[in-house]
Design a protein with these regions (language model features):
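Hydrophobic transmembrane alpha-helices of multi-pass, membrane-embedded glycosylation machinery
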Residues: 181-198, 217, 352, 356-357
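Membrane-embedded glycan-lipid processing machinery
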Residues: 28, 80-84, 122-133, 333-337
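Transmembrane alpha-helix segments characteristic
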Residues: 13-14, 110-117, 213-217, 298-325
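Hydrophobic/aromatic-rich transmembrane helices and adjacent perimembrane loops
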Residues: 126, 133-137, 329-354
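Specific aromatic-rich, kink-prone transmembrane helix
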Residues: 133-156, 165, 188, 344-347
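Intrinsically disordered, polar/acidic, low-complexity terminal segments
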Residues: 6-62, 67, 71-110, 151, ...
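Membrane-interface alpha helices of multi-pass inner-membrane proteins
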Residues: 160-188
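Transmembrane-helix signature of polytopic, membrane-embedded enzymes
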Residues: 100-120, 138-139
């Protein structure tokens, strides 16, 4: 009964916590990436013309429907987007809780794992509502990994088998966006494990791999038509950078692991070598978890923890490979990547606690609880710091609202600095459009 209540109630309480945080730390105003979105899609929110291009899949098509709902019923509220993100994060926590309940993990451990999902190390994604769809994508990733688990049960699961044939298309073509590469790679590697370790039917696995690779291929083709804006990135080649700064990539990669313990901002003025040592410690935990997973997956008949830790590790690699161009060793510690890294941390902890149940040794128990304590303490500090910062962030959002409302009288420099977008002309264009349609900061309730 306790496990069931934990799996169902804690995600609800977590959602309420995020709701309270968002209301205390943000205000309803377009800024940063919203400027681009307004200019691209809000001239006629019902129009399909922005999607009738080769790069359609990079625009994450589900946003078309969500944007219509937001404009029609909420007057293009960024707060609505933020609440959607919080809701899907809570749904992720619910799926994790159900897995812990099924595996009969201790109630206290299950509760702490669920609470880790609601760490405010993701504050940057939570407060930028345009990222709501990424939280939704991770719900679908979890559904895929849990469907693999259902498939591995002795009786099998025909519904799960059918689901795994259509779920990748829904996920990749409509929700995943740039996250689909790691999802696709994780799904394919999982099928390889299923064939080699579980001796399952190769033909069925091949069909599921094709079901992943076909939509991913379409996304890859679509992405080739897109043009990305990367302000602040170097134009040097990676070879030139490695020659001039040989430690940049290793430090970038290692320190990204430190951010799963403590957020960069909450760490304050800690010297960089502390981040490096912390990152190496987390990497060591990853190595132990992968080693234990090799022995564990057959006994548990479960791919879920392995998929989580595998995708988390691959996300660290992807962020390093795609963001080194900003030439900052701590760039990978940004809160905007916390959602991608978080799955690895959860998979690691699940493997450790499932190992405790299997082996029952003191060493396994100490390792599991030690790792849990490390992640919990770090994330408590990060969350406490972010709660402390909430009123200051609120002040910043209120200032953005005032500048946005009075954009006509503001200088270009003020608009660029306050609304965190590089092009003052595009900012003015977006705000004129919102003003003409009485949306967002220009919406006034009728008495």
């Amino acid at each position: 009964m306790g496990r069931k209540m934990t799996a169902r109630l804690l995600p609800l309480f977590g959602f309420l916590f995020l709701t309270a945080y968002l209301r205390s730390a943000t205000a309803d105003v377009v800024y940063t990436d919203y400027i681009r979105l307004v200019n691209s899609y809000l001239e006629n929110v019902y129009s399909l013309s922005p999607y009738l291009h080769g790069d359609v899949l990079t625009r994450i098509p589900v946003n078309y429907l969500e944007r219509i709902v937001n404009v029609r019923f909420f007057h293009y509220s960024t707060m609505f987007d933020m609440m959607l993100g919080a809701f899907f994060l809570a749904l992720n926590a619910y799926l994790l809780g159900r897995y812990c309940e099924k595996k009969r993990l201790p109630v206290g451990v299950s509760a702490l794992l669920i609470l880790l999902v609601f760490s405010l190390n993701k504050w940057e994604m939570l407060t930028n509502g345009s990222g709501w769809v990424h939280f939704a994508a991770f719900v679908l990733f979890f559904c895929h990994y849990l469907s693999l688990d259902a498939l591995l049960q002795k009786t099998g699961d025909r519904k799960a088998a059918r689901r795994l044939l259509w779920l990748p298309s829904l996920t990749i073509l409509f929700f995943a966006g740039p996250y689909c590469a790691i999802y696709a790679l994780t799904a394919v590697l999982a099928e390889l494990v299923i064939v080699l370790r579980f001796r399952r039917d190769f033909r069925q696995s091949a069909l599921r791999v094709i079901a992943v690779l076909l939509p991913f291929g379409l996304y890859f083709i679509s992405r080739s038509f897109s043009v990305e804006e990367r302000h602040g990135a170097t134009s040097e080649s990676i070879f030139a950078v490695v020659r001039s700064r040989p430690l940049l990539l290793p430090r970038f990669f290692v320190r990204s692991f430190a951010s799963t313990v403590i957020g960069q901002e909450s760490a304050g003025s800690l010297p960089d070598f502390v981040f490096t040592l912390l990152g190496l410690s987390v990497l060591a935990l990853y190595a132990i978890a992968f080693w234990r997973a090799a022995k564990l997956i057959e006994k548990e008949r479960s791919m879920f923890p392995l998929c989580l830790i595998g995708s988390g590790f691959l996300n660290h690699m992807m962020v390093t490979a795609s963001r080194w161009i900003f030439l900052r060793e701590n760039y990978g510690m940004s809160s905007r990547y916390a959602l991608q890294y978080q799955v690895g941390m959860l998979g690691l902890l699940l493997i450790f606690f499932l190992s405790v149940r299997e082996s029952g040794t003191k060493r396994a128990r100490r390792l599991a609880y030690g790792a849990l304590l490390l992640f919990c303490l770090g994330n408590v500090l990060t969350t406490a710091h972010e709660i402390h910062m909430a009123p200051y962030r609120k002040e910043n959002f209120v200032a953005m609202r005032e500048v946005a409302r009075n954009y006509a009288a503001e200088s270009d420099e003020t608009l660029v600095k306050t609304l965190s977008y590089h092009d003052a002309a595009r900012i003015r264009k977006a705000l004129r459009l919102l003003e003409s349609k009485q949306l967002n900061v220009f919406y006034e309730k009728k008495e």
